[in-house]
Amino acid sequence: ERFVGSPRHIEIQILADTHGNIVYLFERECSIQRRHQKVIEEAPSAVLTPELRKEMGEAAVGVAKSCNYVGAGTVEFLLDEKHNFYFLEMNTRLQVEHPVTEQITGIDLVREQINIARGEKLSFSQEDLKIQGHAFEVRVYAEDPKNNFLPDIGTLETYVRPQGLGVRVDDGFEEGMQIPIYYDPMIAKLVTFGKDREEARQRMLRAIDEYQISGVQTTLDFCKFTLKHDAFISGNFDTNFVKHHFKPEYLDESNEAEAEIAALLAAKLVEENTQTTASVTPSETRSKWKVNRMR
């Protein structure tokens, strides 16, 4: 087996019906990982050319055809620095990160999967599919990034979801509920969509800031750190991002910097308010009626 030293994790979404129709719904970039498990996904990838996208998509369709596959599935590949790709595995189900594909294609993958199970044909062809915009998903885990991403447990003392244009939250928790030790520590999937990668990224940063969770540690600060990192912004990253770019103390530095900025802004507002108040003379605060009465 070939050793790939700096791999990107790229997967292709496919749908196959019982009538022999198979399509690929483009790729998802899943290279931001910890413990070889995904934390941030996006679609489309920042590095795939249209030609490579088509080649990988057709390869994924070929995998599905080779085993007479029916339903929704994901064919996963490793992509090396020279853009050679290698088959990794096929997941015979909908992935956690399927919402980013729904966002850029406008296709409801859950509905299509149900229709396929009912024996219906796909409602679209490969030629009908187009990439529109860009989407990110961050997995909101009850984990402590400062402690090697160990799972955390406790009660969601505060749980307020972000809202707004291009923001989607898939979850199953409410304020006051318990995060137990018995299951996967994922709390939610936070998804943003924009007309391009930068707009989707900015919306994700805003959504993370607005997501209020207390009672357990979460991966939100780590995701924010990643989204603001130069390597991520440029698209120059691989599955070794955490190893090469992240240290737990960076989160403390980031929070301290934000607190300092907030304090400076607050001081500036107080100063401006004080100056405005001081500039108002007593005569300006009196009504004309009172002034006339005093003459």
Describe each model-derived feature in a short phrase.
Residues E1-R295:
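ATP-dependent carboxylate activation and anion-phosphoryl transfer catalytic cores
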